[in-house]
């Protein structure tokens, strides 16, 4: 055994650490002809352990890049959290724990502007590719004088701008590049539970990190409890109406199909999303629905999913059957939601909350409708329902009209 690795494994683990993904597990290190390298993050290009990584060189931020304007002003609650974020960000990392549909992107516009005005580099990192393009377009509308770029699979020709929006996978390009890193939905697949992506996020940021999510995982909650992460919370959507509480129906498959088709018909004046737990069910159920009406379907395996989602958006009051690929980030105005097979072990509480949170976001249909269809009684579904009711209770505490 090489002395370097032997000393690491039996000498307290203080001799080898990947400078990019921060791995210290000796089983991932390998010695090639050029020396030691980490195999855990080798898919992002080989990094030699003995070499010193240099911070990536990016262009300076334009002086006017921080100027912004939004079509609609922030609500009182949004403005309060936005101001707190700007005030507290200098003291440490922050978790913005906001309900689905609270306007998380708009909440961080102020702190993004604050950093850009001081010539600081900012990155908005997102777990899923299809959300990157939408968020980049939205931020470009707000920051009209800034060069906002989207970096994701198929869009890597330009990787530098005043404001960078990218997938978490693309953070490997930005070693020690950002003064502010905004991690959107860090509890979402594929970022959640991936130590390589977590390491890339840590090494890309030399300043502060803001975590945006409605469903913080145990790691973030523990940091809040330990006092290493400040939590700012927002339980109110901009329109001030409650989050739709799921109606739960349990029964055999044939009865669930009856409930589904009755629901599809009764909500035909709105766009509808039917979430399912697997790709195979997605294809089978969409084929069945297509016998009575036009129906789209999309999964993570569809290479043209952006085009499918765009066609669905343009269809009038259409139906789309989807896996969890649409559970986050994608907003469909006036949409109603059904989760078929909500009791499936493929779903966790966070996924159910996120799927239910697609409904009731728009001012034109602030109440929305959410239906959970289960083969068996599900404690998970009832916990999700209880959490949404608890979030809605904050409206009552503020004396807001429900």
Model segments located where?
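Conserved strand-helix element at the start of the C-terminal RecA-like helicase core
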Residues: 97-105, 115, 120-132, 263-289
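Conserved RecA-like helicase motor core of SF1/SF2 enzymes
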Residues: 185-188, 313-318, 324-366, 374-379
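Conserved segment of the helicase C-terminal RecA-like domain
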Residues: 206-210, 215-219, 358-384
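Conserved interdomain linker/interface between the two RecA-like ATPase lobes of SF2 helicase motors
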Residues: 228-286, 294-295
């Amino acid at each position: 055994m090489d002395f370097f690795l032997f000393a690491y494994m039996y000498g307290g683990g203080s001799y080898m650490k990947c400078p990019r993904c921060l791995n210290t597990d000796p089983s991932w290190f390998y010695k090639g002809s050029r020396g030691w390298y980490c195999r855990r993050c080798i898919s992002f290009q080989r990094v030699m352990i003995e070499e010193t990584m240099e911070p990536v060189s990016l262009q300076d931020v334009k002086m006017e890049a921080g100027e912004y304007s939004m079509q609609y002003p922030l609500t009182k609650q949004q403005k309060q959290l936005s101001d707190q974020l700007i005030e507290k960000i200098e003291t440490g990392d922050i978790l913005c724990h906001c309900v689905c549909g609270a306007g998380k992107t708009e909440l961080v516009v102020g702190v993004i502007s604050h950093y850009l005005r001081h010539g600081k580099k900012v990155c908005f990192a997102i777990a899923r590719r299809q959300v990157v393009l939408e968020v980049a377009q939205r931020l470009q509308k707000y920051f009209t004088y800034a060069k906002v770029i989207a970096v994701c699979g198929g869009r890597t020709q330009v990787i530098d701008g005043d404001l960078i929006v990218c997938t978490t996978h693309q953070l490997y390009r930005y070693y020690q590049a950002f003064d502010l890193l905004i991690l959107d939905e860090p509890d979402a697949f594929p970022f959640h539970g991936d130590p390589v992506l977590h390491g890339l996020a840590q090494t890309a940021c030399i300043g502060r990190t803001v975590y945006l999510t409605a469903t913080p995982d145990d790691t973030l909650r523990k940091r809040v409890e330990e006092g290493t992460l400040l939590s700012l919370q927002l339980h109110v959507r901009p329109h001030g109406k409650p989050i739709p509480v799921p109606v739960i129906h349990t029964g055999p498959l044939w009865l669930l199909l009856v409930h589904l088709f009755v629901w599809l018909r009764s909500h035909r004046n709105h766009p509808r999303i039917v979430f399912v737990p697997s790709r195979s069910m997605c294809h089978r159920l969409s084929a069945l629905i297509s016998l009575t009406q036009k129906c789209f379907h999309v999964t993570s395996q569809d290479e043209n999913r952006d085009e499918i989602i765009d066609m669905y958006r343009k269809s009038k009051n259409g139906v789309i059957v989807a896996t969890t690929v649409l559970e986050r980030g994608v907003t469909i105005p006036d949409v109603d939601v059904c989760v078929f097979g909500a009791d499936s072990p493929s779903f966790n509480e966070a996924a159910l909350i996120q799927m239910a949170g697609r409904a009731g976001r728009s001012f034109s249909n602030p109440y929305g409708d959410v239906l959970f269809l289960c083969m068996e009684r599900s404690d998970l579904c009832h916990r999700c329902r209880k959490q949404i009711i608890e979030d809605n209770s904050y409206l009552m505490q503020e004396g807001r009209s429900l």
